[in-house]
């Protein structure tokens, strides 16, 4: 389901917390297993830069992942992500925890997901977003679907939407323009 643009803008204006799934949202969903059991993942630099811009503009960010990964921990630390939850197969528990810590309600949350495990949070979020290559069931529970795929700029697209709706995009960009 995709809502009218005015309704999306109104929802985006209320967002104070961006919660992201990891595999399939921050990455393309592929996990490359290396000899010895280590793994690697690829992150889009534009997504990361937008996350830094968003935080400078006052948007809080959390990542909730169903897996555990030193690569994700390192990336979250590098980007200054406030909340990282791993091994969260049931994502409602960390969702409730971060809302309590940030003293926010569902309306102030944008959640971005790609698979059926994300549906419970998409149902609750003030702005529910599925990435372009999300499974169809996930798209059905989203207010919008990005034009970009997970791990390929979808997060930047969402952040740009939120910051523009809040009138903060130009200011966020000005830091990098000098």
Identify the residue ranges that each predicted region occupies.
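Short, basic/glycine-rich phosphate-binding loops at helix/coil junctions
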Residues: 27-33, 73-79
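Basic, amphipathic juxtamembrane/active-site segments
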Residues: 2, 16, 30-53
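Substrate-recognition element of Asp-dependent hydrolases with the DxDx(T/V) motif
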Residues: 51-75, 85-86
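Asp-based phosphoryl-transfer active-site loop
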Residues: 12-31, 122, 155
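Short coil/turn segments at beta-strand junctions that form active-site/ligand-binding loops
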Residues: 14-16, 59, 107-108
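Non-catalytic pre-domain segments flanking phosphatase-related domains
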Residues: 1-20, 168-178
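Mg2+-dependent phosphoryl-transfer enzymes with acidic/Ser/Thr/Gly-rich catalytic loops
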Residues: 37-41, 78-79, 83-85, 92-178
């Amino acid at each position: 389901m995709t809502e009218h643009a005015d309704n999306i803008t109104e929802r985006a204006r209320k967002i104070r917390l961006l919660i992201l799934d990891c595999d399939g949202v921050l990455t393309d969903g592929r996990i490359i297993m290396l000899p010895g059991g280590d793994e690697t993942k690829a992150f889009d630099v534009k997504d990361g830069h937008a996350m830094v811009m968003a935080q400078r503009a006052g948007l809080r960010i959390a990542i909730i992942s169903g897996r555990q990964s030193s690569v994700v921990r390192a990336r979250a630390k590098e980007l200054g992500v406030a909340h990282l939850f791993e091994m969260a197969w049931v994502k409602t528990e960390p969702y409730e925890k971060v809302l309590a810590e940030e003293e926010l309600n569902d309306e102030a949350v944008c959640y971005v997901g790609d698979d059926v495990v994300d549906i419970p949070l998409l149902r609750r979020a003030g702005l529910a977003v599925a990435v372009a290559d999300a499974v169809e069931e996930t798209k059905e529970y989203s207010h919008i679907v990005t034009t970009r795929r997970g791990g390929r700029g979808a997060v930047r697209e969402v952040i740009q939407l939120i910051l523009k709706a809040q009138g903060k995009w130009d200011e966020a960009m000005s830091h990098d323009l000098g």
